[in-house]
Structures are given as structure tokens and as C-alpha cells.
Design a protein with these regions (language model features):
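Residue-level signal for inorganic ion chemistry
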Residues: 19, 34, 82, 204, ...
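A short, glycine/Asx- and small/polar-enriched loop/turn
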Residues: 127-133, 213-215, 450-452
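Terminal RNA-binding accessory module
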Residues: 1-75, 156, 319, 373
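Short, aliphatic-rich beta-strand segments
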Residues: 206, 213-225, 283-287, 387
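Short beta-strand micro-motifs enriched in acidic
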Residues: 31, 40-45, 138-142, 207-211
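Rossmann-like S-adenosyl-L-methionine
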Residues: 3-5, 13, 228-455
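Extended interfacial segments that mediate partner engagement and assembly in macromolecular machines
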Residues: 56-71, 76-193, 227
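Short edge beta-strands and adjacent turn/loop segments
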Residues: 198-212
Length: 456
């Protein structure tokens, strides 16, 4: 190792700070953009120009530094949920805009200057408090043998005890997690250990039906397998949670190894069969596995921008690819002749159809299948969409999709991305095929996290 004095100018998706020196990219965990640090730097891995530093001390704090209100952020190890938690809103905005700009530059994409970051008002409590409609917590056991549920430390599978209550989530979630932990402490069940691949309880997932006329609260216990002990326990837990105001309880079975939060099968245990939430004036059903953005206020802004830009007209057909449970499909269907949604998750498509019926929308149709498989079928069927919405997962588009879309009579499309790097990669492909970016904007749906959405 060598001791280096570094200035942090960038941040990785993991939350580690990045410094550049003598052609070397140095990752510095725990450091923030604008920090000046003294660190011990490992030699670069063979064949690379990247290295990892062991943080020693900050010699000068970032000009954007601000004390975090969350005790889990300053714990050691710190919670991995909010790597940017010690930056001002202005600092976070600059960092997130920079993530998009650097991704575009690295891919050689010529684009107009991004519009200002779409963010919650700085004076709004929702910027940092109680804005999430979903929490995922992992089990831990303290030295006295008491269970707790918390978020993982950055880059690890260690649940940070101080993160049992996250100020970004509604208070009821911490109380429900505490109830589950207290009852598990008296049971014979054990936390799942990914390294040894043994144990019972893998995680809990809680979801809030925001904008509901009455509280709608969903609790899911995710376990490795449905043993007799698990069945008995979840029955007792569900009874207690229902007494405390939870309205829907599920048991999720996750028998396979890996980091996926939930398994494929969820069993309804008690209460309603899911909850509801409102987006853009429409109501959507929510179950444990339903994908929805976790920041309701920012979701409204994000979707409104996407729909304003794509501007579906009353005589047009619109494609919504990677449509999930049909949120933007149904919102767009209100102003176009026909909206067609495609998603690989069959359960999401079934929910999308139910959501269409729930909202009385008859001009939306849905297809279950991979986009790269369904597009040729749609083209062969003679569909002639004029506009499209693309909202893929973190990995972006499959390699064949840009050319398939170019073969359609599209006049425009909107791309909503959760990963600047894959967005920039895909944008470069579209530009090669003759498309151009007219405008784009970063959007902040995760205050405190090194994550940025993009609308283009």
C-alpha cells in the first residue's frame, strides 16, 4: 500500500467515493464528492487502472457536507441505504446530475444539456422523511440473542442495528418489524445465513398504500421454506400484526440461493389480498411482488414528465415496453386510441389487466413475454404504433431491441431509465440508427442514495 492525498470528485453506484490520480481510478469507501482525504491505496488489480483505498481520515470535508439526521448513517459500520446522507440537497443534486453527464460522455453520446434535476422541494419534509412506501429489512441477532430487522451495511450482509428505524419510511413499518423481531426471539426459527445457506427467515417486506382513504399496510415474511414451525409462527404473527393495524399479511417462499429479495411464490395469510395505491388519479393493486417506484411524490412527477414528452394523441397507438403492472400504460390510454403493454413477468401482466378493469379502461391490452420476443410478434400482427415508452430494468435494453423499434413507424419515444450507464449505452445505439435525443432530465427518487433516474 501507498499513502496518497486524494480529492474525491465522483461517486460509484455502491456509494464509494472516487478519486483520479496519475491515470488511476481510486475507490474510497466512506468518502464523498468534495472531500479531501489521506488514504492507504492498494496496488491496482492486474490488467486494470482501478484500485481500492483503505480510508484513513478526511483532511477537508466536502463544501456540500451536512450532518445527517439519521443515526444509522454515522454508525460504524454505516447503513448502506444512504451513502449521500451527509450531503446537502444541493450537493446531492450536483452529484446525481454528474452521474448522468459522465455516463453520456463515457459512451460518446452527443445530447442536449440535461435539464435541472427533478427533485422534491428542499423545504419539504418528504425530501428526507417518511417518503418511502416500501421497506426491505434483513434479520440479525444481537449478542443477547434478541432478533432485530435492519438494513445491510454498505457492501455487506451485516444488518446495522441502528437502521431498525429508517426515517425515510412510515413509523408503522418500524413498529411492525419490532413486533416480528420480538416474537421471533421467542421462537425456534433462525435467520437465513447466505454464506452457509441455512436458516429460516430471509427478510421482511412492508408496503404502504399511500393516498388511500384509510390505512392500507402490507407485511410479508420471506422464509427459506414452509416448514410446520414456520406455518405455526406466521399464523401467530399475522394475528398480532392485524391487531396492531396491519391490513394484509403474506408469507413468501424463497428456497433458492442468491440476493433476490423475494421468491416467486407468495401465500396470502390474513387480511385483504393486497393493498391499493393511487398514481395519476388511477388506482393500482399492490401485492408483495408488485414493482412500483418507492417514492410516490416523485413518481407522480416522473410519470407526468414522461407522458408530457411522449404526448400520445387520440388517434395514435402507443407501446409501453417493460410495463410492469401497467401504470404508465393505463395513464397513457386515457389520451390515445390504444395502449399496448409488454412485460416478461406474467404475474405483473395479470395485475395490469385487473388494474385496467379496476379503472374502467378498455383501450389497453397487455402481452406477457420478453420484449425482444414480443416485438417481432407485434410487428407481424401489423401493429403501427406512433409512440412508445421504454422503462427497462437496471440492465437496460436487450441488444436487439433498438433495431426492432427502429423498424416500427415510431415518430418518438420516451426512455425512462434507472441506470445512467445502460441508458447511455442504449442511447448510443439509437443514435447510430438515426435517432436523436431532443431533451433529457435526471430525476431524484432516492434522496440520500447514489441513484438517479433519467427521462429522455
Amino acid at each position: 500500500m501507498t499513502t496518497r492525498h486524494l480529492t474525491i470528485t465522483d461517486i460509484a453506484s455502491t456509494g464509494a467515493g472516487i478519486a483520479y490520480e496519475d491515470g488511476l481510478r481510486v475507490f474510497v469507501p466512506g468518502a464523498l464528492p468534495g472531500d479531501e482525504v489521506t488514504a492507504e491505496v492498494d496496488p491496482p488489480a492486474r490488467g486494470t487502472r482501478s484500485s481500492v483505498a483503505q480510508y484513513v481520515k478526511i483532511t477537508r470535508k466536502s463544501p456540500w457536507w451536512a450532518a445527517s439526521p439519521c443515526p444509522a448513517h454515522v454508525a460504524r459500520p454505516a447503513c448502506g441505504g444512504c451513502a449521500l446522507g451527509s450531503l446537502t440537497p444541493e450537493g446531492q443534486a450536483a452529484v446525481k446530475r454528474g452521474l448522468l453527464e459522465r455516463a453520456l460522455a463515457e459512451s460518446g453520446v452527443e445530447a442536449p444539456e440535461p435539464l435541472p434535476l427533478v427533485e422534491a422541494p428542499h423545504d419539504a419534509e418528504a425530501f428526507t422523511q417518511g417518503f418511502r412506501n416500501k421497506a426491505v429489512l434483513y434479520p440479525g441477532v444481537d449478542p443477547e440473542g434478541r432478533w432485530y430487522f435492519a438494513m445491510y451495511a454498505q457492501g455487506s450482509h451485516f444488518p446495522v442495528p441502528e437502521s431498525c428505524f429508517c426515517p425515510q419510511t412510515p413509523e408503522w413499518m418500524a413498529k411492525a418489524a419490532e413486533t416480528a423481531a420480538r416474537m421471533l426471539s421467542l421462537s425456534d426459527l433462525s435467520p437465513w445465513n447466505e454464506s452457509h445457506r441455512e436458516g429460516d427467515v430471509r427478510t421482511i417486506v412492508m408496503r404502504d398504500g399511500v393516498d388511500s382513504e384509510k390505512p392500507q399496510r402490507l407485511f410479508t415474511l420471506c422464509v427459506h421454506g414452509e416448514t410446520p414451525e414456520v406455518r405455526i409462527f406466521v399464523g401467530k404473527l399475522a394475528k398480532k400484526l392485524m391487531e396492531e393495524g396491519i391490513t394484509s399479511v403474506f408469507l413468501n417462499l424463497h428456497p433458492t440461493p442468491g440476493n433476490a429479495v423475494l421468491g416467486r411464490h407468495s401465500l396470502h395469510v390474513a387480511g385483504t389480498d393486497g393493498i391499493e395505491t393511487t398514481i395519476g388519479g388511477l388506482r393500482f393493486a399492490v401485492r408483495p411482488e408488485t414493482f412500483l417506484q418507492v417514492n410516490p411524490g416523485q413518481t407522480e412527477r416522473l410519470y407526468a414528465m414522461a407522458l408530457e414528452w411522449v404526448a400520445p394523441e387520440k388517434d395514435e397507438v402507443l407501446l409501453d415496453l417493460y410495463c410492469g403492472v401497467g401504470t404508465m400504460t393505463l395513464l397513457a390510454a386515457r389520451t390515445c386510441a390504444k395502449a399496448v403493454g409488454v412485460d416478461i413477468v406474467a404475474a405483473s401482466i395479470e395485475r395490469a389487466k385487473l388494474n385496467a378493469k379496476r379503472n374502467g379502461i378498455e383501450n389497453a391490452v397487455f402481452h406477457a413475454g420478453a420484449v425482444e420476443d414480443e416485438l417481432p410478434r407485434l410487428i407481424a400482427s401489423g401493429i403501427r404504433p406512433a409512440a412508445a415508452i421504454l422503462d427497462p430494468a437496471f440492465k437496460g435494453l436487450e441488444e436487439t431491441v433498438p433495431a426492432m423499434l427502429t423498424a416500427l413507424p415510431l415518430t418518438r419515444f420516451v426512455y425512462v431509465s434507472c441506470n445512467p450507464k445502460t441508458f447511455a449505452r442504449d442511447a448510443a445505439k439509437f443514435i447510430e440508427l438515426g435517432w436523436r435525443i431532443e431533451r433529457l432530465a435526471p430525476a431524484d427518487l432516492f434522496p440520500g442514495a447514489p441513484h438517479v433516474e433519467t427521462v429522455a
